[in-house]
Amino acid sequence: MHPLKNILNKVIWDKRESPDDYVITFIHRGAAENIKMIPFEKIRDVGSSWFTYRDEAENETTIPFHRVTSVKNTRSGQILWRKRGVLV
């Protein structure tokens, strides 16, 4: 199982975690600096190698894990996961 899937599921299912405290950063062509950051609560589903999120226009987008650069707790500043070779 991909380590990122474990982290996403932990935030979703662990009652001690609050999804409101997390953001996910990923490569998104066309966004400023090709990077997009979304609040964790926008995530709708997690698969074996991807997640889907719902944007402001209620469109669902699938993001493969290889495009994710980090998962961060905004309350504590802790980075739960970071892609190798990427500075956050």
Which ranges hold each PLM region?
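N-terminal recruitment modules of adaptor/scaffold proteins
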Residues: 1-60
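Short, compact, well-ordered microdomains
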Residues: 55-88
